[in-house]
Amino acid sequence: MTIIPAIDIIEGNCVRLEQGDYKKITVYDKNPLDVARQFEDAGLKRLHLVDLDGAKAGAVKNWKVLETIAGKTNLFIDFGGGIKTEKDVQIVFDSGAALTTIGSIATENENEFRSWIQKFGAAKFFLGADVKNEKIAIHGWQKITDIDMYDFIKKYLDKKVTQIFCTDVNKDGKLQGPSLDLYKNILERFPDLYFVASGGISSLKDLEELKNIGCSASIVGKAIYENKISLKKLELFNSTN
């Protein structure tokens, strides 16, 4: 199972929000490049980079942070937050992202997202299925829809989008453990999915459990910044899995 460390960006700073609440912000580092280099030095290969300013504004804002990290590391980066137009997708790829992370647009403007799939290819997108009580959440979790998450996942699997990450809004930023039952249900329904767990991870035990139920990868954020899981331990886990 691949470990994907997360960097969330507000005003160029490395931050974390609790449950997507912009009022519950913690600034961890003012230099995201330094953080990314620490991940790379620990042998991690991927990076989940989130533009929280963009997510709130509905347009890409922190593309220069992406450009800097992509230009000065060899990390395989997925980047998302506020991507609403084809121009934004192009900016993300031009700035060095390997994958564009898609969330709200796949729910609110399916035709637009379908056109991006046709232009760039389904393999270039990392689809976020953020959920609360098995319903899709959008706009940085500020809005809970009536869309069933299983229907949502199936729709885009049928369109050949195979990399999907799922964040349980009830768990994120709380370090209370991942939603194992939820993820098991998803993996049982969609065994061919490259499924990435996200939210609530607080220990190596959590990562072992996610690996054991069949997750392809796990996004780890707050647990790193709060020193619940050291980079040394992540490096060891990564090298033996």
Regions found by a protein language model. Give the residues of each.
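Short, well-ordered coil/turn segments that N-cap beta-strands
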Residues: M1-I3, G43-R46, T73-I77, A97-A98, ...
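Active-site-adjacent beta->alpha loops and helix N-cap segments on the catalytic face
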Residues: I3, G54-A70, K84-Q90, S104-F126, ...
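Conserved, mostly hydrophobic/aromatic
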Residues: D8, F39, L47, V92, ...
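Conserved anion-binding
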Residues: G12, L17-K23, A98-D172
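N-terminal beta-alpha supersecondary unit
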Residues: C14-V60
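Short, acidic/polar
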Residues: Y28-E40, K84-Q90, I144-K155, L207
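Conserved beta-strand positions in the central sheet of alpha/beta enzyme cores
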Residues: H48-D51, D78, T101-I102, F126, ...
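Catalytic cores of alpha/beta
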Residues: T73, I77-L99, D181-A217
